[in-house]
Amino acid sequence: PLNNIYLVATSAMDLFRAIDGIDSIRLSGTQENGWYIQEAKDAMESGKMIYAGKYNAPDYELILDEGCGLAIESTMIHHNPEVEEKLEQFGIPVMVERSSYESHPLGRTEWMKLYAVLLGKEDVAEKAFKEQTDKLDKVLTSDDKDTGKTVAFFYINSTGAVNVRKNGDYVSNMIELAGGKYVPEDTGESDNALSTMNMQMEEFYAKAKDADYIIYNSTIDGELSTIDELLAKS
């Protein structure tokens, strides 16, 4: 089983948590205050996990000193191929995490099975994955699975534009699977690697103002506590 993993792909942390594998991660590409997963924050606070630089500026000396067995990168590494080459020159294998390309939520979840193979935790992953599929089956077979409720999921970027998910993206799929209806409806399919698109506030408001629920994507832009904070961004 692998140890002293350098985890740069943040989306993989929750999958490692699900298979009780966080102890195998020694090096983080995200600082403590950037983690929303409590187990990761706790590991960094205790010193079990340490910051080793982000994807485009890793601390090579630290990574080597810690005996890193594998670097798990996000697709952002393709913007800095020299980093991947340097890690491999040092004898550190690099894996690019591509779960974000999965359009179905269970497709993303199933990546835990890959990490389980690396850690020798296949049985744990099979059990955890079945728990998730059972939960989804329960929803899909429910008599009232179609709620008719509309849901908007978005954040406002630094230019004031509204970033929304495209139809067919895993977030919009999760909303549909849960019995909701994603709005705006006409955001197009994910016909390329980008699963999001920007639209002007006026257009977004016209299409989403009657949504039953609005979900602000705080993982990108930070949390909002009040409606006034949201209005200030617009």
Predicted regions and their residues:
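Short beta-strand and adjacent tight-turn residues that come in two discontinuous sequence segments
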Residues: 27, 73, 97, 185, ...
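Solvent-exposed loop/turn segments at secondary-structure junctions
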Residues: 5, 11-14, 31-34, 58, ...
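Sec-exported extracytoplasmic/periplasmic mature domains
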Residues: 7-10, 17-21, 65-68, 88-92, ...
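Flexible, glycine-rich surface segments
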Residues: 141-228
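Solvent-exposed, acidic/flexible segments
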Residues: 8-9, 18, 53-57, 76-80, ...
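A short, gly/pro- and small-residue-rich
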Residues: 21-25, 83-98, 224-234
